Curated annotation (Swiss-Prot):
It is an enzyme of class 3 (hydrolase). InterPro entries: Helicase_ATP-bd, Helicase_C-like, HIRAN, P-loop_NTPase, SNF2-like_sf, SNF2/RAD54-like_C, SNF2_N, SNF2_RAD54_helicase_TF. GO terms for molecular function: ATP binding; ATP-dependent activity, acting on DNA; DNA binding; helicase activity; hydrolase activity, acting on acid anhydrides, in phosphorus-containing anhydrides; zinc ion binding. Residues 427-607 form the Helicase ATP-binding domain. The lineage of its organism: Eukaryota, Fungi, Dikarya, Ascomycota, Saccharomycotina. Residues 1-12 have a biased composition (Basic and acidic residues). Probable helicase, member of the UBC2/RAD6 epistasis group. Functions with DNA repair protein RAD18 in error-free postreplication DNA repair. Involved in the maintenance of wild-type rates of instability of simple repetitive sequences such as poly(GT) repeats. Seems to be involved in maintaining a balance which acts in favor of error-prone non-homologous joining during DNA double-strand breaks repairs. Residues 317-328 have a biased composition (Low complexity). This is DNA repair protein RAD5. The keyword Methyltransferase does not apply. The gene is RAD5. It is found in: Cytoplasm; Nucleus. It comes from Yarrowia lipolytica (strain CLIB 122 / E 150). SUPFAM superfamilies: P-loop containing nucleoside triphosphate hydrolases, RING/U-box.
Length: 1025
């Protein structure tokens, strides 16, 4: 048989289009045998409304069957479609003759590219059916699509027009595959009703359809629109999909994603991993619903949020393989520009000028006016909360939800395109939780305000207070002051059975720590199948920690920013707690990242913002895309109704200050390094500069970033005390968890020489001078202070005086960059050459010369001791440092100077912390040594009015938090703060960075690449000359 002669083409084409599979593969595509061809076209696809009209302008009216064939062959290209029409007249006529009356139903659809949206007649009943997967339930028809499928094998006469087909996903546990492989298998197979595999849906549609099937949102019925009689591998055929919403689609958005056995046994509580399999499936569901509803044209133009949904359609997320979510929680969102964060806090501040005042009858403490107004607001936040969903649709609809009509019916349902949730009930705009965030600035009495609220309804139920371990004693003490009964559920106190406790003793307030919750949460691993599941086994409820099963009247998280990282066990544990009312107390609900707020909202149950899908779509993603103002405005809208924030600088209605506090003075004390200290500092600086230069030369600054930060850490330590450089620091600041290399013999030698420089023994002094000291019946007069010597010392030049006078003379000259000399004979002098004279034995005739110091005092330590000695004898001081090893050195020196010092840091137990704070409060003229990290959390230290900051933090906000532990409500004296800064050092440059509101760990409000570049510039600034 001779081959058919092709007719002259209506259009010229670079290709011949025949029935072979080559004609269906885009030129230049990376198609391989057994692989589906790409669905994208070599030429732009005409607009959906013009393709059919343009085609019929050349060929005349076309039936849907003929149009389907040309659409599949030409892939939407008019020129190719016309040429195919004339090249294959026999096939076209055969396809036309096979058209049946049932085509009328298909012809009622309107074509949109490769998709059609069915519009059933208003007089016809909406298609519905019963599906059996997952149990019997009714599915509701919402529209139909025409999609292109790819033949996965060759076949002959297996499928023809209007044959019913089966849509099938691979039978495997999708939740497990998500956990194992971040790239999901999104293939959707098409089979005949007899089960024979024909192919799979093309890549343009398979991801969304697969997600909808996996999440049990939709069922699909398929039928053939067009297929070649002889299907070859890689060829296309056209399928119509009828879409049905399942009953499960309207259930809790989280529960259907668990397998049926797990769903019956487990209670979904808190999903707080970086992105768990549940969060991933929810995100996939949301993307697929947005995609499907867009294709079905179910979004009306007059809906209030139609523009938002269309934006989501235009920029809908890519499949996870192309845009995987961040696996680092800290990078989930970029840092907030400092100016924007300050402005956000300013906008949510409440003046309360119109807020009425609430008195608490019998409350023993006097509340200030702003506290009474705040109490009114807090009480209003604990009023009864109505159900989030209500059948009464007379009120305003929640702005995040959109009303959608079932096709051909007066019935409707509601969809939240930001989360993928569906409901048949009217979503009213209602308050979703009871409680809020009390975010008053530090020192305005958040604790007293909370206790007043508890006291008001103390007989209603128990309030659980969760606080850092260092504040447990403070809460217990404050409760006792106002007459509230307490029980401290911590350490040994946490071993008690809560049910038994409340049978015999019902405290007004149960006080526990975040540490205790973390400890109890660890028990869930054995009971609930693992912490990564974020679920608790109901079958083991009798063994579950009782603090997670008891329903409290109220829960208060003090210093709630402790749970700012949603991946921490502290955050997860707090979100398991159950209560009618929930409160978060924190002066900084947002520290420097928007993600800081998410965990607090999750704890509060602030729907819908406690759902990570909402948070990601409305806040995280816009912020990462540079829409900073828009994202922060959304955060402002979230916070305004649930946050009460006042600051010390605010005014009351009559213009008077909100709170009157004593004056606070902050001074910067410049400290000069000694020559030996400068040598060590210069050596460390040179090493850091060399490291930076080598990294720049090899373009590896980013890879060596931590190593360079290590060098900067050494510089900071050498400013405090050179001995710190080689000490393993147990409590290095959180942004500097860096290891210090110790195999540098030259640096070790320099520091050893600094510590042990030229030991002088008493035997160098002549026996004549010792004898002269033994014969003295009374102490000599000091040549420096001209008073009787109470603590005798002798120098190498054999001149005597007060030990402090001789030592201070040397230190003063060193601070002025002068060579120290004796004030009497002008011979060279040094601290190592001064010995304290100790008399022992009968008549104090036995003389012992004691070296002034076992090691030299650093310049900062000298400056601190000098300042402390200048204070009145009964003055109390607090000394802050980031380095606990430095606090060890300071403590040793203060003891040597007979200055009473107490130590407060993270190494102390709760009882030890309580004892330290009590002793410091009762003492006079004492010093409290405290780590900056511990001192920045909740402590009330108003018994002291002098503060010394030994080393600067990267941001002054951290130092300000520590200072406000002294300068707060209850302080009656002026507060004096001294910040010690070494001249011509990295510390001075850190002050400049503070003033520019920049942070080394990441410059704010820039793209990732800009942040990296700015970090490098900051390093250059710190290490520059």
């Amino acid at each position: 048989m001779e081959p058919r002669q092709k007719k002259a083409r209506f259009f010229d084409s670079e290709e011949d289009f025949g029935p072979d599979t080559k004609s269906l593969i885009r030129p230049g595509s990376s198609h391989k045998p057994g692989k589906p061809a790409s669905n994208s076209l070599a030429r732009p696809t005409p607009a959906p409304s013009t393709f059919r009209s343009d085609l019929e302008a050349f060929l005349g009216p076309l039936s849907d069957q003929r149009f389907g064939l040309l659409l599949a062959k030409s892939k939407g290209n008019v020129e190719q479609a016309v040429n195919i029409h004339f090249d294959l007249p026999e096939e076209v006529q055969q396809a036309t003759s096979e058209e049946t009356a049932e085509e009328a139903e298909v012809s009622q659809t309107t074509t949109s590219g490769f998709e059609t949206t069915q519009k059933p007649s208003q007089n016809t009943q909406v298609p519905s059916r019963v599906h059996t997967r997952g149990g019997c339930s009714t599915s509701r028809f919402i529209g139909s699509l025409v999609v292109t499928a790819w033949a996965s094998k060759s076949s002959k006469g297996k499928v023809k027009y209007q044959d019913r087909l089966v849509v099938e996903r691979q039978s495997h546990d999708h939740s497990k595959s998500i956990r194992k492989n971040p790239t999901d298998n999104s293939h959707v197979h098409i089979r005949t009703v007899s089960g024979e595999l024909l192919g799979r849906i093309s890549g343009e549609h398979d991801y969304s359809i697969a997600s909808l099937i996996d999440s049990r949102v939709c069922d699909f019925e398929a039928s053939c629109v067009y297929a070649d009689h002889n299907l070859s591998l890689g060829s296309n055929f056209v399928v119509e999909l009828k879409c049905y919403l399942t009953e499960e689609a309207f259930q809790d958005v989280a529960m259907p994603l668990l397998d049926s056995k797990t769903a019956k046994k487990r209670e979904y509580v808190f999903d707080n991993s970086r992105e768990s399999h549940v969060e991933k499936m929810l995100r996939n569901r949301q993307i697929a619903i947005v995609d499907l509803f867009g294709k079905l044209n179910l979004i009306k133009e007059n809906e209030a949020n139609a523009d938002m949904v269309k934006d989501m359609l235009r920029a809908k997320s890519q499949p996870p393989s192309s845009q995987p979510p961040s696996q680092n929680s800290e990078d989930e969102s970029e840092p907030i520009p400092t100016d924007e964060l300050d402005a956000l806090y300013k906008r949510i501040e409440k003046e309360d000028v119109e807020q009425p005042e609430t008195e608490v009858e019998g409350f023993p403490l006097e509340l200030r006016r702003y506290q009474k107004q705040g109490l009114t607001w807090m009480i209003s936040r604990e009023t009864e909360v109505s159900e989030y969903f209500d059948n009464d649709d007379s009120g305003p609809i929640n702005p995040l939800w959109t009303k959608v009509d079932f096709p051909g019916s007066d019935e409707k349902f509601y969809v939240n395109f930001s989360s993928g949730a569906l409901t048949l009930k009217f979503p009213k705009q209602e308050r979703s939780f009871s409680g809020g965030i009390l975010a008053d600035e530090m020192g305005l009495g958040k604790t007293i305000s909370t206790l007043a609220m508890v006291y008001r309804d103390r007989h209603v139920g128990c309030t659980l207070v969760v606080a850092p371990m260092s504040l447990l004693w403070q809460w217990e003490q404050e409760c006792e002051r106002v007459g509230l009964s307490t029980y401290v559920y911590h350490e040994k106190g946490a071993d008690i059975d809560l049910d038994e406790l409340f049978k015999t003793y019902s405290p007004n307030i149960l006080i526990t720590s975040y540490h205790t919750l973390v400890s109890h949460y660890g028990q869930i691993k054995a009971l609930g199948g693992g912490l990564d599941r974020n679920v608790i086994s109901e079958t083991s409820s009798h063994e579950r920690p009782k603090i997670f099963t008891k329903h409290f009247h109220r829960i208060v998280l003090d210093e709630a920013h402790v749970i700012k990282n949603r991946n921490t066990v502290s955050a997860k544990a707090c979100c398991l707690l159950r209560a009618t009312n929930k409160w978060a107390l924190t002066g900084t609900p947002i520290h420097n990242r928007l993600e800081d707020l998410f965990s607090i909202l999750k704890f509060l149950g602030a729907a819908p913002w406690n759902d990570f899908i909402y948070w990601r779509n409305f806040i995280t993603l816009p912020f990462q895309e540079g829409k900073i103002v828009s994202a922060l405005m959304t955060v402002q809208c979230i916070l305004e109704p649930i946050v009460l924030r006042r600051t010390k600088n605010m005014k009351q209605a009559d213009g008077s200050p909100l709170v009157v506090l004593p004056k606070k003075t902050i001074n910067i004390e410049k400290v000069a390094l000694t020559d030996q200290e400068r040598v060590i500092y210069s050596y460390v600086l040179a090493r850091a500069q060399t490291s930076l230069q080598k990294s720049e030369a090899s373009e590896a600054v980013g890879r060596n970033y931590l190593n360079i930060l290590t060098q900067i850490l050494r510089l900071r330590q050498s400013c405090c005390d050179p001995a710190l450089i080689l000490r393993p620091e147990a409590e290095v600041p959180t942004d500097e968890q860096l290891q210090i290399e110790e195999n540098e013999s030259q640096l070790k030698s320099m520091i050893q020489q600094y510590n042990d420089d030229t030991q002088t023994s008493a035997c160098e002094y002549s026996s004549e001078i010792i004898a002269q000291l033994q014969d003295q019946s009374a102490p000599p007069e000091c040549p420096i202070c001209a008073e009787d010597v109470t603590k005798l010392a002798i120098s190498k030049c054999l001149h005597m005086g007060c030990v402090d006078c001789l030592a201070d003379n040397v230190r003063f000259q060193e601070s002025k960059k002068q060579t120290p000399v004796c004030c009497i004979c002008r011979q060279p002098a040094a601290l190592k050459d001064i010995f304290e004279v100790e008399r022992t034995g009968e008549d104090c005739k036995d003389i012992r010369l004691k070296k002034l110091s076992d090691r030299p005092r650093s310049s900062k330590l000298v400056a601190l001791v000098s300042k402390l000695k200048q204070l009145p004898k009964d003055a109390k001081s607090v000394v802050f440092s980031q380095f606990t090893s430095y606090l060890d050195i300071i403590q040793t020196e203060l003891r040597r100077e007979k200055i009473q010092a107490f130590r407060f840091d993270g190494t102390l137990s709760r009882q030890q912390r309580t004892d330290v704070l009590k002793a410091f409060g009762l003492s006079k003229g004492s010093v409290l040594l405290i780590s900056l990290k511990t001192g920045g959390v909740g402590l009330n230290l108003v018994t002291a009015n002098h503060a010394f900051i030994m080393d600067p933090w990267w941001t002054f906000a951290q130092e300000a938090q520590a200072i406000d532990r002294i300068h707060r409500m209850g302080q009656t004296k002026d507060v004096h703060v001294t910040r010690f800064i070494v001249e011509n050092s990295v510390e001075e440059k850190m002050l400049k960075i503070q003033q520019q509101k920049m942070v080394l760990a990441g410059t704010l409000g820039m793209s990732e690449q800009e942040q990296k570049a700015q970090r490098i510039e900051n390093i250059k600034t710190l290490l520059g000359e």
